[in-house]
From Swiss-Prot:
Protein name: Putative zinc finger protein 542
The keyword DNA-binding belongs to this UniProt entry's keyword annotation: yes
Cross-referenced InterPro entries: KRAB, Znf_C2H2_sf, Znf_C2H2_type
A Pfam family assignment: zf-C2H2
Molecular-function annotations in GO: DNA binding; DNA-binding transcription factor activity; zinc ion binding
Ranges annotated as C2H2-type zinc finger: 98-120, 126-148, 154-170
Annotated PROSITE patterns: KRAB, ZINC_FINGER_C2H2_1, ZINC_FINGER_C2H2_2
Family, as annotated: Belongs to the krueppel C2H2-type zinc-finger protein family.
Domain KRAB, residue spans: 1-42
Organism lineage: Eukaryota, Metazoa, Chordata, Craniata, Vertebrata
Keywords from the named record: DNA-binding, Metal-binding, Nucleus, Repeat, Transcription, Transcription regulation, Zinc, Zinc-finger
Subcellular localization: Nucleus
Function according to Swiss-Prot or TrEMBL: May be involved in transcriptional regulation.
Gene name per UniProt: ZNF542P
Source taxon at top rank: Eukaryota
Amino acid sequence: MLENYQNLVWLGLSISKSVISLLEKRKLPWIMAKEEIRGPLPGYFKVSEMTISQEPKAKTRTLFGKDVPGAEIKELSAKRAINEVLSQFDTVIKCTRNVCKECGNLYCHNMQLTLHKRNHTQKKCNQCLDCGKYFTRQSTLIQHQRIHTGERPYKCNECIKTFNQRAHLT
């Protein structure tokens, strides 16, 4: 994604430094509400504002309001770059539909979000109060707590040793 923004800057489109900074940190520069999914991105560039030279090659281009001599822009490659960036936006837009309301993480597939949500709910239910570890099942937590309490409910009839898990009996 950052590379696509760099391509837009190379083409002469102005992108704010804060947006590039967010992309370098691998964060999205915006989060859209469901109603705005197909709308334009407010506060950012608009492709319609970009002008491409009608000549096959332009000898200069403008970057942040300054002319850069010797730069060549082909109309075809500029259109290709824009289409590539727009396809990336479609991917980002699809991913913004599945946002975790608790922590703000983005997921492209609804199933990924569903699995992620379990992390938030299970932390409250299955956390060991002694060491802070989290468990997906309460039965696993109960087994784990025997380590802290020293409880050994399973006894071997042959050697008289005791164990904290039935699976350790052989």
